[in-house]
Amino acid sequence: GVEAFLNRNPGMSVVAIEDGQAAGAILCGHDGRRGCLYHVCVAEKYRMRGIGKAMVIFCMNALKEAHINKVSLIAFTRNDVGNAFWKQIGWTKREDLNYYDFVLNEDNITKFNMD
């Protein structure tokens, strides 16, 4: 789970605390060659304060220290706020890739769907 991921990638992830609450977080790691930002989020009431950018800079610096040269992330196409953010801070949308999923354990996915 998340604990194992954090243990494999020490010092890479970040949680922003504002007013004693978690305002945002990034789960960050790498495979030795490419870094990846997972589950990037900033609570709506804390957006437009530079928190997201500061967290990205933290993660990018941690990856640079680990000699990682490229970083990727996945953003849903319908996430207009997130996609505008990535474009605004200079990330490039790749047009040359297709993204594929294969579900190994449906229970693992649906148990988090708390609708």
Language model regions located:
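Acetyl-CoA-dependent GNAT
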Residues: G1-H39, F58, A62, A66, ...
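Active-site acidic-Proline motif in GNAT/NAT acetyltransferases
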Residues: H30, A43-R49, T77-R78
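Conserved beta-strand-loop-alpha-helix junction that forms the acyl-donor binding cleft
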Residues: L73-G82, D101-L104
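Short low-complexity, flexible loop/linker segments enriched in glycine and/or proline
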Residues: K87-Q88, I109-K111
